[in-house]
């Protein structure tokens, strides 16, 4: 059963202290006004998915086509757009806002982002090669990758050979990151360990594909309207008269 993920912005890393005194390194992710922009249905599009938007963009910096797309959904222009495949029963209404409580403490998630670009890198940095010897006749080529193999036949270097080249700035997914803490009021999700990308970069968060979903998972999604209804119901329950003693 697939449910939607969320779009978040990477704010940086810090640490949290657990009740037993242990400290945990966490990456802080900001769920910034994530709203449903469009639905993709099997009848109309051939697949089932939700299109989400996050952040805020200036209208004058948004193309006319996108302005019309956002206006149709009755949402403000967004900085980042992404689609998430979902099950038909987990579609969410257009315009709904998904909050940080979509994930709970202890849950495992998969996070995808664009890794930090490192430019042109040598074989030792890019592929963890050992390099050549420091002495014994080796000059200048200490950090080179060495021979690329082959002879007159086949007379070429095979495709995919590990060599120096561009490193980073590619799509990377880190699996099975544990959610340590969530802050729905500030829209923060704190996950244990590192997350691909630089500070200020956009990432997508999904339920871990290699871990089963817990019974406490919210379906189809944790939305702002549900949170408002829960807040309104809480005072009413507290004010209800108790029975005679």
UniProtKB/Swiss-Prot annotation:
Feature: compositional bias, Low complexity: 230-245
SUPFAM superfamilies in UniProt:
Translation proteins
Q: Which residues carry this modification: N5-methylglutamine?
A: 152
Superkingdom as given in the UniProt entry: Bacteria
Name the segments for region: Disordered: 224-245
* Gene Ontology MF terms: rRNA binding; structural constituent of ribosome
Give the GO cellular component terms, alphabetically. Answer: cytosolic large ribosomal subunit
Which keywords fit this entry according to its UniProt record?
Methylation, Ribonucleoprotein, Ribosomal protein, RNA-binding, rRNA-binding
PTM: Methylated by PrmB.
Q: Name one Pfam family in it.
A: Ribosomal_L3
Any GO BP? translation
Oligomeric form and interacting partners: Part of the 50S ribosomal subunit. Forms a cluster with proteins L14 and L19.
> Into which family does the record put it?
Belongs to the universal ribosomal protein uL3 family.
Report the function annotation for this chain.
Answer: One of the primary rRNA binding proteins, it binds directly near the 3'-end of the 23S rRNA, where it nucleates assembly of the 50S subunit.
Instruction: Report the PANTHER family cross-referenced here.
Output: 50S RIBOSOMAL PROTEIN L3 (PTHR11229), LARGE RIBOSOMAL SUBUNIT PROTEIN UL3C (PTHR11229:SF16)
* Name of the protein this chain belongs to: Large ribosomal subunit protein uL3
Q: Which gene encodes it?
A: rplC
């Amino acid at each position: 059963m697939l449910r939607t993920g969320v779009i978040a912005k990477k704010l940086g890393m810090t640490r949290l202290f657990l009740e037993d005194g242990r400290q945990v390194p966490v990456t802080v992710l900001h769920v910034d006004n994530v709203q449903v922009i469009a639905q993709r249905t099997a009848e109309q599009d051939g697949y089932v998915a939700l299109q989400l938007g996050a952040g805020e963009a200036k209208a004058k910096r948004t193309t006319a086509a996108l302005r019309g797309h956002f206006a149709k959904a009755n949402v403000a222009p967004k900085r980042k757009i992404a689609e998430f495949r979902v099950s038909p029963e987990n579609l969410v209404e257009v315009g709904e806002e998904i909050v940080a409580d979509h994930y709970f403490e202890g849950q495992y998630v998969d996070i995808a982002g664009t890794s930090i670009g490192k430019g042109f890198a040598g074989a030792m940095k890019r592929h963890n090669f050992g390099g050549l010897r420091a002495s014994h006749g080796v000059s200048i080529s200490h950090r080179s990758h060495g021979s690329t193999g082959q002879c007159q036949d086949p007379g070429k270097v095979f495709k995919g050979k590990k060599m120096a080249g561009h490193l980073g700035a590619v799509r990377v997914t880190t699996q099975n990151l544990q959610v340590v803490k969530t802050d729905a009021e500030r829209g923060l999700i704190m996950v244990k360990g590192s997350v691909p990308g630089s500070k200020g970069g956009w990432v997508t968060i999904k339920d871990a594909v290699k871990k089963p979903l817990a019974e406490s998972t919210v379906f189809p999604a944790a939305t702002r309207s549900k949170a408002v209804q829960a807040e309104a119901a809480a005072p009413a329950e507290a004010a209800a008269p108790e029975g005679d003693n």
